Amino acid sequence: QMCIRDRVIRGKEKLCGAEHSVMPDRIAAVTYMCCAAVTGGELILSGADIGHIGAVVPVFKEMGCRVYSFGKDSIYIKAPERLKAPHTIRTMPYPYFPTDAQAPLMAVCTVADGTAVFVENIFDNRYRHVSELLRMGAKIKTEGRVAVVQGVRRLSAAELVSPDLRGGAALVIAALCAEGTSTIGGISHIDRGYEAIEKSLYSVGADIRRI
């Protein structure tokens, strides 16, 4: 059962200056963790707070990944050679599983052993990336808010078009583990949420470039 918390704000006539550190992007952190997971890799993410993704970490662990806080503001993840599909992922408002992590995790589940079920409880029409993943050989069936993903051994490269921000990130994740060379159009969607994602991935060994 979801807990609803009220916030009451009482204004003042005068405000004073203050210093505040902007929190790191938790969805970007999850996306790069997905990249490590889908490639069987090992990664340390700096400037990331594991406390912000508390609902997602158990999913990675269920898939067989080792995940823990590394230092003051870093996250360590090491993926197994073959991932296990998580049973059910239900999107909910914070602090539960975020809807923006649904598409990236679905891309990972396309090559995991077993079947994963996604239930999208936040937005309608949130499975626009599925048609592109199917073109890569993924096995996904959708009905309403539910998507059932049956893992395959390997995806195949394809010419793809990013449908939206997180869907585009999902295609990048899928392309990293696909056999062959994929191209992804519509990257302006991806640029809205990630700063030079190709440079970040290239820096850790991915064969990726912007054309």
How would you name each of these model-derived features?
Residues Q1, R5-I211:
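Short, structured segments at the rim of ligand-binding sites
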